[in-house]
Amino acid sequence: MAVTMDGVMGHLHHASGSTGVVFCSPWGFDALCTVKFHRLVADDLARRGFPSIRFDYPGEGDSLPVEEGATFATWVNAAVRAAAELRRRTGCTQILYYGMGIGATVALQAGRQDDKVAGYMLAASALSGRRYLREVALREKVIEDGIGIDFGYSPGSTVLASFIMDPRLAADLKAVTVAVDTVSPNLPVLVLARPENAADRDLAEALGAAGASVTCTDFTGYGAMLDGVVTSPMPMALIETIGDWFSRAIPAEAVSRPSDAVEAEPMMLSTTSFREQAEIVDTRLFGVLCQPASGTESAVIILLNMAYAPHNGWGNIWVDTARTLAHQGIATFRVDLSNI
């Protein structure tokens, strides 16, 4: 179920349990490659009684752009807002924050602001913004050297596989770091460690030394998942392992759904030039209809993606295209193909 909240697009997975899960995704290309994985994890958790919400950071994916540029605080505030929306719509009372990549830092910072944090799941964590930016730059250099093309990005840009980070956010990240010894003692934490990455296992040890109840497991399939979206290898055994950990470590008592949780609320995002609404086609396909703000359109274009790329497209190309066309009076429908 799609939801909107202060210009942010999210996806809610209903369940009746008292513990909800907020998904804090990685950035850019990594987020593109893990949409399906996170959907499958959220679906499995919902079957086990854990409601959850996935969302696009402000200025990313389907969420509205930030007028003066996104900051790291903007992202953390979006995670806090997503937790409030999850509580409002499902009645869950405590939140476990899941973060992957730089999203692990978002998750930890959001959890610090939640007096009913239930725990954390941290996957392929990047807890130093400066180190993360260096890794992004190295990955992009490998891509550009491999294909021998100069894309003409502005000097100093933070880019990965056609995704360009907001300069204000990149500047913010240089000063962002998280000290794990501030995690509350006895909180359950699941660490998904990349094979042959000592930093992930060091993180698990540091969390344990700080008093957290830590489980560390291999992030099997990590490399294949982030290799692109031409194929869609999913680590189904890992998804089962994650679900089993939740069932063991987190209470899943049922709660009553709040009376103001109205599923018929319109999922609308709008600006002075366009308005967008999430649509479900034949109960199977998800897409976003983008129309001119005037309500008058001269044509409708269907935007389809290649392989397993979600509807926002590489570098958010279809989101940008749809909103540009809406300004010119043309409506579009960008859609996820089956099994995304």
Which residues does each predicted region cover?
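The alpha/beta-hydrolase serine catalytic core
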Residues: 5, 114-243, 252-253, 259-264, ...
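Active-site signature of alpha/beta-hydrolase-fold catalytic machinery across serine-
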Residues: 109-113
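Terminal, non-globular segments
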Residues: 1-11, 46, 53-55, 198, ...
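N-terminal cap/lid segment of alpha/beta-hydrolase-fold proteins
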Residues: 1-19, 244, 248-299
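Short, surface-exposed "cap/lid" segments of acyl-processing enzymes
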Residues: 15-56, 292-337
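Short glycine-enriched, charge-decorated loop/helix-capping segments at active-site entrances
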Residues: 37-38, 66-71, 231-232, 317-318
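Gly/Ala-rich beta-loop-alpha elbow adjacent to hydrolase catalytic centers
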Residues: 98-107, 124
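Catalytic nucleophile-loop/oxyanion-hole region of alpha/beta-hydrolase
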Residues: 60-94, 338-340
